[in-house]
Every structure is written in structure tokens, then in C-alpha cells.
Amino acid sequence: MRTATVSAGLLLVAVAVTACGAREQAAEPNPPSMQANAPVEPDTSQPVASGNTPAAADIAAVAALNASFDPKRDPVADLETAKVEAMRGGKRIMVDVGGEWCSWCHILDKFVEEDAEIRSFRDAHYVWLKVNYSEENENKPFLSAYPEIKGYPHLFVLDADGKLLHSQFTGELEKGKGYDREKFFAFLKAWAPPEK
């Protein structure tokens, strides 16, 4: 029994010494290689849907397009970002014109966010771009390139190159104090990019 205890003790000491040596080796830095310091560029030719992960900055930029109706945002630059993402993902661009002052804009946001099927369809087929229209910034230079807007929110469907395909007065998609799910979903489906 005493031999087994001594053997077990020696084994524990050997394991501890080996583990400490391994930690010391791991702590020594490896000299950096020139290749490790080279900047990594995201491959924008690959669609996000293919499983490629875009750079974190790309993700943040795309998320910001639909975050709010911000009078300080540049819709021309935002449209360029939306076009890159639309080409990358084989999507269309939905330009949502409105403002934080617009109650129907918030109703539309809530309607889409609370309906998992519509939200999922939107995310799979569209890059959603909010463009502010308010007293602070009417974005006239940008919006002058599109048909007249009759009410807010207003939706413009663009192809991935930014070409206008459709202008949608959202009043036609309303029902009572909200949006008609059947009409709204039919609108999204009608203007989604063709299946490949």
C-alpha cells in the first residue's frame, strides 16, 4: 500500500512539472510573421447567404440602414451600402421614407417586427433602407430622383443596382389602425427578386 501511495505521489509530481513546463512554453510569444499582419479584406463578391461572414463593419453598416429615420444620415451613401449588400445577397432594396414623427412609420415597424414570417421574408429578400423626411432634413436632393410621395411611410422598391421598380403608397396596405397582413405580404412577394 505504501508503494502505491509513493508511486501515485511521484506520478502527480511528474504531471505537475510537465503541466508547468507546457504553460511556460505557451507563454513564450511566437515571432509575428509578415503574413499574419496583412490586412484581411472582406470578399464582397460572395453572397452573405452562401455562409460567408461579412466583416463586422459591414454588418453594422447594413443594420444601421434600418435602425431609424435619422436626419443626420446620408441617404446617397446609405444607398451605396444597400446596393453592395443587395448584390452580395441577391436581394432587392426597399427604401422606406418617413420620420420619427410619423406614427404610421412606427406602426409599420412594429407590424413587421412582430410577424416572424413577414420579418423573415423581408430579411431574406430585401435590404431595408430608411430615409428620413422631416422638418430638420427633407432629403430633397435624394428624394427628387423618385416619384412624388403622397403620404408616409412611403416605400420604393429598387433592384440591386438602385433602379426604381415600384413606388408604393402604404395607405393602400392599411387596414383599420394597422396594416393588412395579406396585402402587405402579397406586396413583398410581388416585388421580391425572382428565385434562381
Residues covered by each model-derived region:
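Bacterial N-terminal signal peptides
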Residues: S7-T18
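Bacterial signal peptide processing site
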Residues: C20-E24
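N-proximal helix/coil linker or "cap" segments that precede and/or mark the start of modular domains
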Residues: A27-R73
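A short beta-strand-turn-helix
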Residues: G51-T53, R73-I93
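Thiol-based oxidoreductase modules, predominantly thioredoxin-like and allied folds used
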Residues: R73-V76, E113, I118-E138
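Short active-site neighborhood of thiol/selenol oxidoreductases, capturing the structured segment around
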Residues: G89-S103
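Conserved redox-active cysteine motifs that mediate thiol-disulfide chemistry
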Residues: G99-E113
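Non-catalytic, surface beta->alpha helical segment in thiol-disulfide oxidoreductase systems
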Residues: K150-E195
